[in-house]
Amino acid sequence: MDKGRERMAAAAAAAAAAAAAQCRSPRCAAERRGFRRELDSWRHRLMHCVGFESILEGLYGPRLRRDLSLFEDCEPEELTDWSMDEKCSFCNLQREAVSDCIPSLDSSQSTPTEELSSQGQSHTDKIECQAESYLNALFRKKDLPQNCDPNIPLVAQELMKKMIRQFAIEYISKSGKIQENRNGSIGASLVCKSIQMNQADNCLQDEQEGPLDLTVTRTQEQTAQQGDGVLDLSTKKTSIKSEESSISDPSSENAVAGRLHRNREDYVERSAEFADGLLSKALKDIQSGALDINKAGILYGIPQKTLLLHLEALPAGKPASFKNKTRDFNDSYSYNESKETCAVLQKVALWARAQTERTEKSKLNLLETSEFKFPTASSYLHQLTLQKMVTQFKEKNESLQYETSNPPVQLKIPQLRVNSVSKSQADGSGLLDVMYQVSKTSSVLEGSALQKLKNILPKQNKLDCSGPVTHSSVDSYFLHGDLSPLCLNSKNGTVDGTSENTEDGLDRKDNKQPRKKRGRYRQYDHEIMEEAIAMVMSGKMSVSKAQGIYGVPHSTLEYKVKERSGTLKTPPKKKLRLPDTGLYMTDSGTGSCRNSSKPV
């Protein structure tokens, strides 16, 4: 029995331990979550059924319930939803046309006008009352604010009151116009027109006191502008206006036809004046050689026959009549087409003239630095002037050679670099840059003209490397006109080109252009580079410090230092020529040799 009790106690202890340590299986975890969710729901249901006050009373006693009863009278009363009043002075306001006052009409007017004036007086009284009620509803007061801020002057107060009243009157008058148009009442519209005229008179009288109002006199300004304005050559507005006038009033067709006839006569006179001015400009351009007859006719909109006639009449001293030609031109084409074409061609001619003047000015400004006189001709004559520029450049260099000028001494001091290029060389390189930019900006230089220029100039690919810029260097530059002057690298007072000393090399590279330099990292002084390499290899400077002091490229300096110290991962191939044979031996640095009978 004792053993059985011990076993049961051990099982109970194991069950308690198992209950204390939660099972990690997903099934047990799901069941536990379900139990927790159900307990939470029971808690909410208990609070909903029993009531929160009862739970608080059971927890804290009846004193809390008694304290909460003090706030029962403080709850707001229930209010009905807001609804708009049946008759609101602001929402349901009868709006009609209004004015400040209608003056008494003259006795000479007829009886219908007197009846209309009496109706207008009654309308005016109603509208004034409506304006007052509108202002009262707007400001939520019975009367307008009489007592304003004492700091505001009296003149400003009166002006503000007048502006507020004018705003109310105009607002009601505009809404009244809309209602009258919907109802179709003709008599009321006449009253509105008379009221608007009276408002215009009142505004003209009160110009000095009140602010300027442009809304009333806008129609009068439009009619004045139409009468005194410049003639409009567009066909859309005139056609639309003529159609509207013919539809609205058929009796005004004769007046419209007469107006169009006068406009057409005015157009013919103006077009003749414009044509005379354009004709004189076209003849000047043709005589100066800037344009030929075909281009001048297209740009200025003048027939070629007319230009030929005037060119023939100029030497004889008898100017041809251009008005007859314009009449024939207007007869051959319709009125609308000739008008639009003339306007477009006039704009095109003015634009082309401005463009040519702008290009000529830019060319002159570009060549002022090189002390050359570039001809002020059209851009398509550019290839004919290159030869003249070459000759002038040659004469200038010959005159500079007679001047004895010692080249400046190059100081090899750290942090100080002196340019070793002579004055003539600097002028030559700047000139080549200018000529290159001019050749690139000229858009009419075609391939055929360039080929002719290459045939004229001598074909020399080798440049002189011992003196200043010579004629052969300029010729070879123009021979390869599509290259930048950066290809002619300035170094140590010389101009470097593709160096081939033998005739075989020249024959092989007759049809090839020189290789372009790879960038500014090759433009350095070799002596300064040698000094920088020596400083780095001796350990006195690092590569970065030597680059900053001597101004040499960092990558080139580092490569040359590693090459001379033998620390390159892939050393360059060495070319060694055997003394006895004409063979070249290539050593790749790995111990393998290879012979080749052809030099690389």
From Swiss-Prot:
GO biological process, one term: regulation of transcription by RNA polymerase II
Region (Disordered): 103-124, 239-260, 494-521, 564-600
Ranges of residues in domain HTH psq-type: 515-567
DNA-binding region: 543-563
Tissue expression per record: Expressed predominantly in the spermatocytes of the testis. Also found in the kidney, liver and heart.
Biased composition (Polar residues): 105-122, 587-600
Cross-link (Glycyl lysine isopeptide (Lys-Gly) (interchain with G-Cter in SUMO2)) at residue(s): K241, K318, K339, K396
GO cellular component: nucleus
Major location (coarse): nucleus
GO molecular function: DNA binding
Subcellular location(s) of the protein: Nucleus
Keywords: Activator, DNA-binding, Isopeptide bond, Nucleus, Transcription, Transcription regulation, Ubl conjugation
Function: May act as transcription activator that binds DNA elements with the sequence 5'-CCCTATCGATCGATCTCTACCT-3'. May play a role in spermatogenesis.
Designated name of the protein: Ligand-dependent nuclear receptor corepressor-like protein
Gene expressing this chain: Lcorl
